[in-house]
Amino acid sequence: MNKKEKRPTVLFFDSGVGGFSVYREAKKLLPNWRYLYCFDNAGFPYSEREEESIIHRTLAACQLINQRYPLDAIVIACNTASTVVLPPLRAAFDIPIIGTVPAIKPASEITKTKHIGLLATKGTVKRHYIDELIDKFAQDCIVERLGTTKLVEIAEQKIRGHSVDLISLKDELSPWAGMADLDTLVLGCTHFPLIKDEIQLCLPQVKYFMDPSAAIAKRIKYLLDDKNLQVQNEKYNQMFCTAHFPEESQFKKALHLWGFESLEVIKID
């Protein structure tokens, strides 16, 4: 690779590995870019944390990584964090900061029955900005909200090589099981596309699953293509976490399947 070649470096940040759903779409669209991924497992799950804590931890991690690997963009691949951290991040960095917003607008456009389900974390479904999105784009729809931490944990376990507990999943989704005309589901947490097939088994009436990951990848491309980028000599993608964890050795062995070369623990507390 020519040292003068401009190869964008993009950081994906989440409290867990849900952001993989966004990262994989970006890598599919832009395979030759350099990707860093940081998951704040010491602070997981963000849906259970106060806003100030989420802001502090996100800023600390992004600033630490940026000092070592100058970044061209940061993707907050977490719906919960995106509701609170984007303004302070944009104040701290002069690079594109891209958030994740539940796809309520496209869901309202594709639904045939005007009955939509928003599946997200407990923190996200309570945010005022969800009310604003529904008022702006889906006033003519019935929008069910289901906040869950259990599905986040199930997705985390799947990424780490465990089979999905369909009984627990079905139980968590049971409030919607009898809604025969619920035809559209907004996957309002980046973890949920990772278990979309299993969710579909539990809710067979749903025909449309709205995942913003591909749109985010296109947004990254639009913002960084032909821009003044950092010149990077490193050729590999790297992952960071904020604490050691029990299955770390097995997790490291599977990194190459996702296109990463190494996992490093960083301290942000």
UniProtKB/Swiss-Prot annotation:
Which EC class does it fall in? isomerase
Which regions form coiled coils? none
Q: What reaction gets catalysed by this protein? A: L-glutamate = D-glutamate
- The residues listed in the UniProt record as binding substrate, with positions renumbered to this chain, are 14-15, 46-47, 79-80, 190-191
Q: Which GO terms fall under molecular function for this chain's record?
A: glutamate racemase activity
| Swiss-Prot/TrEMBL keywords | Cell shape, Cell wall biogenesis/degradation, Isomerase, Peptidoglycan synthesis
Its pathway, per UniProt, is:
Cell wall biogenesis; peptidoglycan biosynthesis
Question: What domain of life is recorded for the organism?
Answer: Bacteria
Q: Which residues form the active site?
A: 78, 189
Q: Name one GO biological process term.
A: regulation of cell shape
EC number in record: 5.1.1.3
The question of whether Repressor is a record keyword is answered with no
Entry's SUPFAM superfamilies?
Aspartate/glutamate racemase
Assigned protein family: Belongs to the aspartate/glutamate racemases family.
Quote the NCBIfam families the UniProt record gives: glut_race
Function in brief: Provides the (R)-glutamate required for cell wall biosynthesis.
The identity of this protein, by name, is Glutamate racemase
